[in-house]
Amino acid sequence: MKTVNIRGVILGEGIPKVCTPLVGRSLKELREEINLLKDIDCDLVEFRADFFEHVENIQKVKEVLLEIREALKEKPILFTFRSAKEGGEREVESEFYCKLNKEIIKTKLIDAIDIELFNEEESILELIKIAHDEDVKVVMSNHDFHKTPPKEEMISRLVKMQELGADVTKIAVMPKGSSDVLTLLEATNDMKIKYAKTPFITMSMKGVGMISRISGEVFGSAVTFGASKKASAPGQLQVKELKEILNVVHNVL
C-alpha cells in the first residue's frame, strides 16, 4: 500500500492521524472553533460545510474558507459537504453538490476534498480529475447511519473507491451491537492485508464502536476523527484524549 502526503501529513504509516471537524453553523461559531484549534494537537482539520448556515451561497463559503486557511496556516484542510442521506445536515441537488465541490477545489485553499461514492459515476470522475489537476487529494467516502453492511459489501465499496481513483477511501457504519463492530474490524483487517492500494479510513459509530476509532494502527485505518468542541458523528472522542490513547496503543505495539 502506498502512503499519501497531504500538506506534509503522511497517511498510511505509523500512528493514525487525527482529523478534527469544524461544525459551526454561523461565522461566529466557526471563529470560536478556529480559535480553539490553535491549542489543539490535531493533524488535519475537516471543514464540514453542510453545517454552515450560508453553504448554499458559494461565495460566502469561499470567504469563510479563506479565514480558516489564514488562521490554520499550514494545517491540512479537508473540505466536506456531507449529504443528508449520508448523515449530513442538509440535502441539496446533485448539480449544486458538484458545483460547490468544483469551485472549492479551484480556490487553492484546501488540501483534500470528500466525495461521496454514491453519486453519478460521471460526476465523480469529473470531480476527481479537477481535484488532481489542482493537486487536491480525494477522500472518497460512504456513510451508513442505519446499519452495518456485511463485511464483503464494505470491502467492495472501499475497493470500488480505489478503482475510481480516490487517494484515500473511507467508510463509516452504524452498529446495532458489538457483533457489528467486529464485522467492521474484520473488513478493516481484510482490507489492510488483501486489498488496500491506498490509505483507507474505517469506523463504527456510537459508543459501542469507539474501539474502532482507537485501533487503527492495529487493523489498518489511517485516520480517526476527534472533536475539538462539538462532535460531528456519534462516538467521537475529544482530540486530547484520543491522541493519548493512540500513543498508548502505539507504544505497546
Swiss-Prot record:
What CDD domains does the database record attribute to this sequence? DHQase_I
Residues the entry annotates as binding 3-dehydroquinate: E46, F47, R48, R82, R213, S232, Q236
- List the catalysed reactions: 3-dehydroquinate = 3-dehydroshikimate + H2O
Active site annotated at which positions?
H143, K170
As recorded in UniProt, its EC number(s) are 4.2.1.10
State if Nucleus is listed as a keyword: no
Lineage: superkingdom: Bacteria
The protein's matches in InterPro entries, at most eight in alphabetical order, are given as: 3-dehydroquinate_DH_AS, Aldolase_TIM, DHquinase_I, Type-I_3-dehydroquinase
Q: What Gene Ontology molecular-function terms does this entry list? A: 3-dehydroquinate dehydratase activity
The keyword Membrane is assigned to this record: no
List UniProt keywords, sorted A-Z. Amino-acid biosynthesis, Aromatic amino acid biosynthesis, Lyase, Schiff base
One Pfam annotation, family name? DHquinase_I
Q: Which GO terms describe its biological process?
A: 3,4-dihydroxybenzoate biosynthetic process; amino acid biosynthetic process; aromatic amino acid family biosynthetic process; chorismate biosynthetic process
Q: What class of enzyme is it?
A: lyase
Cystine pairs annotated here are none
- Specify the pathway: Metabolic intermediate biosynthesis; chorismate biosynthesis; chorismate from D-erythrose 4-phosphate and phosphoenolpyruvate: step 3/7
User: What family does the entry list?
Assistant: Belongs to the type-I 3-dehydroquinase family.
Q: What does this protein do?
A: Involved in the third step of the chorismate pathway, which leads to the biosynthesis of aromatic amino acids. Catalyzes the cis-dehydration of 3-dehydroquinate (DHQ) and introduces the first double bond of the aromatic ring to yield 3-dehydroshikimate.
Quaternary structure (record):
Homodimer.
Q: What is this protein called?
A: 3-dehydroquinate dehydratase
- Organism the protein comes from: Clostridium novyi (strain NT)
